[in-house]
Amino acid sequence: MAMTTRTLLLAAVCAAAALPRGWSPIKNIDDPHIQELGRWAITENNRVSPSDELTFHRVTGGEQQVVSGMNYRLEIEAASGGGDVTGSYGAVVFEQEWSNTRKLISFDKNHNF
């Protein structure tokens, strides 16, 4: 009986370790990698939506989530209209460093994280 209980407990722990975690605040928003992700998100958005080209200023906030890689929810300050008008944008970026994968999951002017 004790062996069965330990086996079930071990199985539960392993299963929990494989599940995605909740979102947690990015500890150092000024980290060069985080700023690069924000710059990349703006560049990628400009590529798929060239009608309203944005200029990256900086990442101002965000959260991260461990999955099979990492999801990032970023609050990005950027300028539109040739740099005259700045605004806050939201981007969700998936990154898997070991496979060199990066995807822009969503991008929104009126983000609600």
Swiss-Prot record:
GO molecular function terms attached to this record: cysteine-type endopeptidase inhibitor activity
GO term, biological process aspect, one: defense response
Signal peptide range: 1-18
Record key words, sorted: Plant defense, Protease inhibitor, Secreted, Signal, Thiol protease inhibitor
Pfam families: SQAPI (PF16845)
Residue window of motif Secondary area of contact: 65-69
Gene Ontology cellular component list: extracellular region
Full protein name: Cysteine proteinase inhibitor 6
Organism from which the protein derives: Oryza sativa subsp. japonica
